[in-house]
């Protein structure tokens, strides 16, 4: 249960924009796994240390994805699937095509021998790669495959899985491809599965504003400012407030 607590705890702090506390979760788990922070024997003995060590890459990868503080990590055989996805997203946003290709290759190789979760992440990364190359139809085909897989699954009850939700990423890709109408649908679906998720609210606000749906954009941006209350320094918060103020003057 301890691993669930730090998993959900960090995720919750990230959604609220408390990035300092989210980093603290990582530091604490690293200290506990490296400096004998677990009791000898029992559930919190060696097993607890192993769970802590295995959780660190997940927490670090999630931090990169949620904060969008992009970091391209080396792609190696030891890279976890979550690290590969975080690296692929970072590479896509920073223009590192080689790192993006390397991450895609690794996830594709693993997807044939692992569960559906790896296949979903592989499709997400393939979509990022082809979207960046201007292959819109190919990118959407990969995302459609990812959607088909997750639709057979129940919505997450805790933290997002994969760490970059499929519908959210699909919406962001569609925005980049200049298809805001379709993006609106994807962000709405993302919010059905994970209500009030800030990155999906931000995407819905942007897409709705682009298609001229003022009411929907205003609702999404307003909800975002509530989730990120007090996060005045966030670019997304500033964007939301700017839109809200613009509607007050019209």
Segments (PLM) and residue ranges:
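TPR/TPR-like (Sel1-like) alpha-helical repeat modules
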Residues: 13-32, 92, 105-108, 147, ...
């Amino acid at each position: 249960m301890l691993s669930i607590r730090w998993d959900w705890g960090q995720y919750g702090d990230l959604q609220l924009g408390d990035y300092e506390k989210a980093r603290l979760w990582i530091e604490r788990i690293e200290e506990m796994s490296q400096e004998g922070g677990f009791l000898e024997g029992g559930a919190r003995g060696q097993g607890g240390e192993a769970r802590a060590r295995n959780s660190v890459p997940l927490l670090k990868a999630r931090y990169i994805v949620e904060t969008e503080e992009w970091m391209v990590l080396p792609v190696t055989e030891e890279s976890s699937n979550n690290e590969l996805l975080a690296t692929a997203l970072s590479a896509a946003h920073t223009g590192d095509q080689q790192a993006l290709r390397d991450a895609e290759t690794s996830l594709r190789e693993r997807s044939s021998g692992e569960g559906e979760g790896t296949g979903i992440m592989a499709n997400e990364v393939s979509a990022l790669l082809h979207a960046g190359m201007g292959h819109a139809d190919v990118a959407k085909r990969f995302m459609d495959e990812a959607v088909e897989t997750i639709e057979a699954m129940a919505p997450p009850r805790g933290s997002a899985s994969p760490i970059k939700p499929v519908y959210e990423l699909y919406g962001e890709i569609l925005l980049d491809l200049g298809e805001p109408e379709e993006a609106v649908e994807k962000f709405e679906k993302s919010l059905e599965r994970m209500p009030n998720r800030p990155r999906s609210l931000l995407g819905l606000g942007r897409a709705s504003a682009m298609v001229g749906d003022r009411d929907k954009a205003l609702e999404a941006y307003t909800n975002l400012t509530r989730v990120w209350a007090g996060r005045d320094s966030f670019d997304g918060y500033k964007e939301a407030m700017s839109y809200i103020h613009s509607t007050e003057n019209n």
